[in-house]
Amino acid sequence: MRYKASTLRIIEKLKELYPEGLCSLQYEKDYELLFAVRLSAQCTDARVNLVTPALFTRFPTLEAFAAADPREVGEYIHSCGFYNGKSKDLVACAQQLLERFDGKVPDNMEDLTSLPGVGRKTANLILGDVYGQPSYVCDTHCIRITGRLGITDGSKDPVKVEQQLRKAIPPAESGPFCHRMVLFGRDVCTARSPKCEDCPLKVDCAQGKKLK
């Protein structure tokens, strides 16, 4: 498949800005990343990273999570917001991982999205970061920035954006690209008052070109 030269330049520039292109959530076990991503909904990764050390110490195994009282789990994740729903999802997810998948995090979209609290965004992240598969993680940063850049058509629908990114971004670049979108969205292309004049991508940005 042929890709737009401007998109490839954006990918390379982002590599220069953020060489690692890694998820900022901290974890040691595969299921810990799955749970951390669930906690990150409507919450910052920085806040999740403050919460998970104590959470994963209190519940050090899937079995411990599966046997946990959601109310106690909720006490550990209270500051992440929406803790009642999230705590129930973590416990139910742990139970299903043990009952249906022998304690292993699934390696395919269908099984992942069948788990409590796991949507396409979370599943894509797991497929990319855990299994090294092509993954198009369409969070708010990615949706906003790719629309501004002109890589996508500006749709706010995560599924539509994912479909467009699959055609626009080489599979091998997909996971790191989406992680870099998050970092770039925090540093430069913010939701409000983006730093367009100082943006290193403005030469290839659809909105940036309008500023000239």
Model-predicted segments: where are they?
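Catalytic cores of DNA base-excision repair glycosylases
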Residues: R2-K212
